């Protein structure tokens, strides 16, 4: 199997755009620093081409054995493609056991086929930072040292004392008082200089719109159930008293059911519909056809039966 079997052809369209964008993020300065760092630890030369020098995985596996001895027990020196891919897979597994984050890893094809050299560079920089965190001393200052946990153990007395402390972000309550505050229930004057309203002279009064609950009572309030007169100054209507109730509002004082009849007929009297003369079915005729409002009417027998229910 030839070494060109895994090589891809040129990219076009969106694939070419994505590849060019990844290549634009590749930093040659970081590559030079990684080259110096790897060659200084392993003692092996990478060569002029960074990708081709690390493609077989032998230098990377040697690097992991320097950082963590025995992490890659077998290194394949063969030029076969699957042997080189096996070396890269063993190197990636060794980085995981070394404590690398999964998001910082690269795939074997990213280096073997030069698919994403930017991710390879990011992974090697993260590996250098992890080695610096674990105390590795090298002649090249490369990588970012990871922060360490700062754990503190406090006893119960210290924890309880901390509950009485207010942090600086919360402000302070030292010498806190209510001096200068408006008294409860007093006036809070609203004024506007544009409307020529004078500023408040004191804080001891409260406006009518704000109300007050000081010495609150119902003096001057309209009695429940009394008349509330609605008037309009534009129409010339005058204000009335607050002691009467209109007919539309009803009347509930001394209400009872006296004078009401339940179950009986309610005769409606109208002179227009009560003609003088004889009426069929035994109804009274003449001037007495329609009884006066004060007289008791005579009802047909079926009215009497209806009243008996």
Swiss-Prot record:
InterPro entries: Calponin-like, Calponin/LIMCH1, Calponin_repeat, CH_dom, CH_dom_sf, SM22_calponin
Keywords noted in UniProt: Acetylation, Actin-binding, Calmodulin-binding, Phosphoprotein, Repeat
Tissue spec: Heart and smooth muscle.
Domain Calponin-homology (CH): 28-132
Signal peptide: none
Keyword Repeat: yes
Pfam families, per database record: Calponin (PF00402), CH (PF00307)
Keyword DNA damage: no
Modification sites for N6-acetyllysine: 8, 25
Positions carrying Phosphoserine: 138
GO cellular component terms, semicolon-separated: actin cytoskeleton; cell-cell junction; cytoskeleton; extracellular region; focal adhesion; membrane; specific granule lumen; stress fiber
Gene Ontology molecular function: actin binding; actin filament binding; cadherin binding; calmodulin binding
Highest taxon above the source species: Eukaryota
GO biological process: actin filament organization; actomyosin structure organization; cellular response to mechanical stimulus; cytoskeleton organization; establishment of localization in cell; hemopoiesis; macrophage migration; negative regulation of macrophage migration
UniProt modified residues of type N-acetylserine: 2
Alphabetized SMART domains for the sequence: CH (SM00033)
PROSITE patterns membership: CALPONIN_1, CALPONIN_2, CH
Renumbered residue ranges of the record's region Disordered: 283-309
Mapped Calponin-like repeat ranges: 166-191, 206-231, 245-269
Similarity comment: family membership: Belongs to the calponin family.
Chain's role: Thin filament-associated protein that is implicated in the regulation and modulation of smooth muscle contraction. It is capable of binding to actin, calmodulin and tropomyosin. The interaction of calponin with actin inhibits the actomyosin Mg-ATPase activity.
Protein name as catalogued: Calponin-2
UniProt lineage: Eukaryota, Metazoa, Chordata, Craniata, Vertebrata
Originating gene: CNN2
